[in-house]
Amino acid sequence: MEEVMISPVEHDPQGQVKQQQAAGVGILLQIMMLVLSFVLGHVLRRHRFHYLPEASGSLLIGLIVGILANISDTETSIRTWFNFHEEFFFLFLLPPIIFQSGFSLQPKPFFSNFGAIVTFAIIGTFVASVVTGGLVYLGGSMYLMYKLPFVECLMFGALISATDPVTVLSIFQDVGTDVNLYALVFGESVLNDAMAISLYRTMSLVNRQSSSGEHFFMVVIRFFETFAGSMSAGVGVGFTSALLFKYAGLDTENLQNLECCLFVLFPYFSYMLAEGVGLSGIVSILFTGIVMKRYTFSNLSEASQSFVSSFFHLISSLAETFTFIYMGFDIAMEQHSWSHVGFILFSILFIGVARAVNVFGCAYLVNLFRQENQKIPMKHQKALWYSGLRGAMAFALALQSLHDLPEGHGQIIFTATTTIVVVTVLLIGGSTGKMLEALEVVGDDLDDSMSEGFEESDHQYVPPPFSIGASSDEDTSSSGSRFKMKLKEFHKTTTSFTALDKNFLTPFFTTNSGDGDGDGE
């Protein structure tokens, strides 16, 4: 006779009540930490206290609550609501963050630096991964640190090369800086995540199969295939949505709810489509965001445009803040391997060296193909090197390594990664403002005379055909607003887009004639 399984919840009503209570307490604590993080972030912004950025504050809140939960011996049923699950991160938290990055992107600064961005993100990340892995293996061979197998060192190099400069970019916007530097840091970080994931998964496959070196040669080819396929999927979904909203006639007052619902579903469809066929959802949803903002957005009614802009900004802010809280709490709750402190210390040193090889080497390569007045200046290279924070992506991959690596090696890598994340987010994130001042790349916070000098310095690097000082609208009180105005001015005047967009794409995919700027702003 077939045995009928009865779940504990059905068998024990009292247990069901306790589980519901634990869920309520866990979710309540999460909401309280979110509220506290947003209030703290508002206070920090209002008082212009850049030594503790919002992301750092959220991480600290998670760490403190996690430590208190450990000390107070919180019930396991409540703790389970705070365990960082990489599947939850990749499927629910990451997509809105990446889509908002593409949706809010000013495309012309991004695409005018696209060659440099791809160089840093693909070649640079590959170089940084190999250099980090090689140095870690060499350090182990010289008995300076715990020795890991070579492939596992490369896995560590791949996951720790995933940058997450959310903190740096927020400070860039607050204090104001060069639009090209902002585009380089932003673009490199987004595409770098896809490269790091691809490298990590490939090395994990090599480690499981313990096979020949042919897989190492296939890493680059596989990434290019993944990148091209993911970009094509994202662009295809974006163009499909543009045609749908152009010809479906949804921009009427009684269909705004349907219009907004469909618009919100397309990004997630793009992400899941790419992940479902073995491509990169990150790259796919990024380009979906770029295409939907430029072509689909203008096909919406004004009310729907206002709603979807606010909605994606809201969801992205919630996901971003929750990720850092989630990560901080889990760091405090997880078991760590502190018996190999040397591995942690040397890893911090090695990723700094690898980041330098990545940035300065790729910048040299990019400058070889640029005119003298368009070369990346050294102060921008230094800022780019300093902006290589590690965050949620590296943490999620390190958490995955606990399952991928046996014999406690994953625990060592996880402990080293969490330490690096905390150190870079708190120390580097908190000192970014001073770094920008020291490198003299601060823009809108300076006085008028220095601002004019900054405008002149822009002509040393992809000279923008605009003059910030010539505007009569500089009475705005917020430096962040002035920075956004500068981005918008750059977006409207630069000539990086070809006539193809104006004469063919915009008229075909939108209700616009293509005679305007087509910003969709």
Swiss-Prot record:
- Where along the chain is composition biased (Low complexity)? 467-480
What is the annotated tissue distribution of the protein whose record heads this document? Expressed in roots, leaves, stems, flowers and siliques. Detected at low levels in roots and shoots.
InterPro entries xref list: Cation/H_exchanger_CPA1 (IPR018422), Cation/H_exchanger_TM (IPR006153), NaH_exchanger (IPR004709)
Q: What is its main location?
A: membrane
Give the signal peptide range.
none
Which terms in the Gene Ontology molecular function aspect does this entry carry? sodium:proton antiporter activity
Q: Look up and give the membrane topology term.
A: Multi-pass membrane protein
Instruction: Give me the Lumenal side stretches, as residue ranges.
Output: 45-48, 137-141, 187-222, 293-310, 362-382, 433-521
Please state where this protein is localized.
Endosome membrane; Golgi apparatus, trans-Golgi network membrane; Golgi apparatus, Golgi stack membrane
UniProt key word Transport:
yes
Q: Which domain of life does the UniProt lineage start with?
A: Eukaryota
Membrane spanning residue stretches: 24-44, 49-69, 116-136, 223-243, 272-292, 311-331, 341-361, 383-402, 412-432
Intramembrane residue segments, as ranges = 87-107, 142-162, 166-186
- What reaction gets catalysed by this protein? Na(+)(in) + H(+)(out) = Na(+)(out) + H(+)(in); K(+)(in) + H(+)(out) = K(+)(out) + H(+)(in)
Function statement: Involved in trafficking to the vacuole. Required for cell proliferation and cell expansion, but not for cell differentiation. Acts in low affinity electroneutral exchange of protons for cations such as Na(+) or K(+) across membranes. May also exchange Li(+) and Cs(+) with a lower affinity.
Kindly provide the name given to this protein in its UniProt entry: Sodium/hydrogen exchanger 5
Which species is the source of this protein? Arabidopsis thaliana (Mouse-ear cress)
Gene symbol of the encoding locus = NHX5
